[in-house]
Swiss-Prot record:
InterPro entries: DUF2433 (IPR018829), Glutaminase_GtaA (IPR052743), Metallo-depent_PP-like (IPR029052). It comes from Schizosaccharomyces pombe (strain 972 / ATCC 24843). Residues 702-716 have a biased composition (Basic residues). The modification Phosphothreonine is found at residues 456, 458. It holds the Pfam family DUF2433. This is Uncharacterized protein C16H5.12c. One of its GO terms (molecular function) is catalytic activity. Keywords: Phosphoprotein. Residues 1-32, 448-523, 559-579, 691-737 are annotated as: Disordered. Transmembrane segments: none annotated. Residues 486-496, 568-579 have a biased composition (Basic and acidic residues). Residues 13-32, 448-457, 722-737 have a biased composition (Polar residues).
């Protein structure tokens, strides 16, 4: 059993004659009391002609002529939302539909920006309708200009109506009241034939979107078409009439194109209807995509069974609606309409039934599973598709506006800009670090740049300034620290000996080196120092006095001790740990983060409200996080309630001290000073990635606990932690509100 059995109704009346000797056949529309001719209407084109396929011009009908000129097309196929509106359509359009039309109308977008055409609910619908009605041109569509022949189509245009159309305007075209040269409406009653060289292409169409619960509702429409309040939809009578039309015009020499507004791949009933019409290609609107799509069911279904399941679901949905309204519908329809409904019901009943396991296991998808090719078209403003027919070969050309992926260029700059979002400390540890020969080396260029950019000198810079000033008083360069220590030693040795008999300046007197100095290598180019320079600023005391000796020694010792502390302060915990053979962190660049950790906290505004007396101006960045971020599993553990907390960053540790006394939080809210020592920034298994990267770090891990037991623990102690200096973020007591 095959799904292709849906073609049996059409094959029951085969046609072997050519188009020229085929007799005309008519069907009556009982509601309109008119007879419609479905005989073939032929358009003869040259070989290698081009067929332009577009969708959704939305009333900008003149765009069709522009695209025809661009693509050098011989005819046009349009798949819905054509713009069948006139001025009299405005009062009957519902508010929701009118706002949708105004939002996407290309005619209104060309107008100067004005609140009169604002489609948001803040603009009253009455004002919006008055603005559209008072405009000199019909903003809903250019159709009135084509009806008056002020504008004309340059080539034949074949259209089906879409979702946003006026059903009353369509009925005027069907009754013959309205007519536009070169405009042909393809529907369930009207089919057209394209003769391109020796190739015949039959156009079959079905207008409106497929809405299952509206299949038996005609709305304000008369006859088989349905619509109301500015919208239209497909009915079961249209589908039944289309089956009759396809049956009456069957010709084995023709290639068939089935034109719909609703994408066929999304609805199993429409897919089955295309199979019943023996279509080779289908054209549908593309749901306003920026790229066109071409596919068959074999492309989008991983197996024939999956395709049959889609048909089965569509069958169940249709039959559920039909069984609900069947009794009421049979009382209202005429015998002709009942025949059309039975055509569709018989078509759907041949689709797979999920409740029949034998049929599902033994049914085949048919040849349409691979041979029926579907095209979803672009909106006319975003692109087009062109069929080039040459000697029976159908080629496809396509153009699309596409998506702008230029924002990807910024991805490479995100890491560079990341530093600008992280508050920098004013300490000297903010340079660029890299490792060479297991030693931490600081980039001098980056270090100098950061030092110059610092407006306020740090404590270390003040120390260096004092050293430089004091060394200038001694007449030495800072680089001669060894010479300075040696000369200080000489002065101490001299004063520890017998007192001088003569009080003469040391300048110009050759001193006898001490025995210790004789053993040391001589330093060339050493300048002699005047005692007056040494004693400058100390009250011009004499060398022989003990007070002078003590003062000089205290100053020198204080300078040396302070310099040693400053040099030791520059050494980070990572450097100290590196000297002790501890594995250094070689990941992303480190930044010392200064600020507070507030929990619970749900928003930036809430975090700023805790900073009183204007201290919120010290805040440079706020990050809101949740406590469930620590878990790797996407599902939150049970018995764990997520808690939002905030990281509040400030410029430096001085800003932390200023803001600390002005933080006022309610009861139940905790404020901690963030601790971001180098130790906590290293690649620790217990600190990063939930103990999954601890191998090789010397820490206890969850690896190696099998037959061999745990890995050997590290034999050296952990690196030293910060001593709590100003430039280091140390742990401080929690501040409670």
């Amino acid at each position: 059993m095959s799904v292709d059995t849906a073609k049996s109704d059409i094959q029951a009346e085969p046609s072997t004659g050519t188009l020229e000797n085929k007799s005309s056949k008519t069907y009556s529309d009982s509601e309109n009391n008119s007879t419609l001719d479905v005989s073939a209407q032929v358009l003869t084109l040259d070989n290698k002609s081009r067929i332009l396929c577009i969708a959704d011009v939305r009333g900008e009908l003149s765009l069709i002529n522009s695209l025809v000129e661009e693509t050098n097309a011989s005819c046009v196929i349009h798949t819905g939302d054509f713009g069948f509106f006139e001025r009299s359509s405005l009062p009957s359009i519902s508010e929701r539909t009118l706002r949708h039309i105004v939002q996407f109308s290309p005619l209104i977008k060309k107008l100067p920006r004005s609140k009169n055409f604002d489609y948001y609910p803040s603009n009253p619908i009455g004002d919006l309708k008055n603005s559209i009605a008072s405009h000199p041109d019909c903003l809903l569509s250019e159709l009135p200009q084509f009806l008056s022949q002020e504008k004309k189509f340059s080539v034949p245009v074949y259209v089906v109506w879409g979702a946003c159309e006026d059903v009353h305007v369509l009925e005027k075209f069907r009754s013959g009241e309205y007519s536009i040269p070169n405009l042909n409406i393809v529907d369930e009653l009207h089919s057209y034939l394209l003769q391109i060289g020796d190739m015949k292409i039959r156009l079959l169409g079905l207008g409106g979107p497929y809405v299952p619960f509206k299949l038996f509702d005609n709305g304000d429409g008369k006859g088989t078409i349905a619509g109301g309040q500015g919208t239209m939809w497909t009915t079961i009578l249209q589908m039944g009439e289309l089956i009759e039309t396809a049956k009456s015009l069957l010709d084995r020499e023709e290639a068939r194109i089935f034109i719909t507004h609703h994408p066929i791949g999304r609805e199993g009933v429409l897919s089955q209807l295309a199979t019943a019409c023996q279509a080779d290609l289908t054209l549908s609107a593309g749901l306003h995509f920026r790229y066109g799509a071409s596919y068959n069911e074999f492309c989008v279904n991983h197996s024939p069974e999956h395709y049959l399941q889609k048909l089965s679901a569509a069958r169940a949905q249709f039959m559920e609606v039909y069984d609900t309204v069947k009794a009421e519908v049979e009382k209202m329809v005429t015998p002709e309409q009942h025949h059309l409904i039975n055509n569709v019901v018989r078509l759907v009943s041949r689709m797979p039934d999920a409740t029949n396991s034998y049929a599902m296991n033994n049914m085949l998808p048919g040849t349409a599973f691979k041979n029926l090719w579907n095209f979803n078209l672009l909106d006319a403003s975003f692109g087009w598709t062109v069929f080039v027919v040459e000697n029976g070969h159908v080629q496809v050309e396509s153009k699309s506006h596409g998506f702008n992926l230029g924002y990807r260029r910024m991805a490479s700059r995100r890491n560079e800009n990341y530093a600008s979002h992280i508050p920098r400390s004013t300490s000297e540890n903010t340079g660029t670090y890299y490792y060479a020969n297991n030693r931490l080396v600081e980039s001098q260029a980056q270090f100098t740049k950061n030092r110059e950019a610092t407006a306020t000198p740090t404590e270390e810079e003040q120390i260096e300034g004092y050293d430089q000033e004091h060394t200038d008083e001694l007449g030495m360069s800072r680089a001669n620290t060894t010479e300075e220590s040696a000369e200080t030693h000489e002065v101490i040795e001299e004063k520890s000996g017998p007192p001088a008999a003569e009080e003469e300046p040391i300048s110009g007197v050759a001193e006898k080196p001490s025995p210790n100095e004789e053993e040391q290598p001589a330093i060339g180019g050493k300048e002699e120092v005047d005692v007056e320079e040494v004693t400058k600023g100390t009250g011009n005391l004499e060398l022989g006095e003990t007070t002078t000796e003590v003062t000089i020694l205290e100053q020198e010792n204080a300078a040396n001790v302070t310099r040693s502390q400053a040099q030791e302060g520059r050494r980070t915990d990572m450097q100290k740990g590196n000297d002790r053979e501890f594995r250094q962190y070689s990941g992303e660049q480190r930044y010392e983060r200064c600020g507070f950790h507030i929990t619970p906290c749900n928003s930036e505004e809430e975090a700023r409200s805790y900073f009183k007396d204007g201290t919120d101006s010290l805040i440079t960045n706020i990050q809101i996080r949740t406590s469930l971020n620590r878990y790797k599993s996407p599902q939150a553990p049970q018995n764990v309630n997520p808690t939002n907390y905030a990281y509040v960053f400030v410029e430096n540790q001085n800003a932390v001290s200023k803001a600390l006394g002005s933080i006022k939080v309610p009861e139940g809210v905790r404020v901690n000073i963030m601790r971001d020592d180098s130790y906590y920034r290293q690649n620790r298994g217990w600190y990063r990635n939930n103990r999954m990267e601890g191998h090789g770090t010397g820490m206890r891990t969850n690896r190696g606990r099998g037959r061999g037991g745990r890995m050997n623990r590290m034999q050296h102690p952990r690196p030293l932690q910060s001593g709590g200096s100003v430039n280091k973020q140390s742990a401080e007591p929690t501040t409670h509100g």
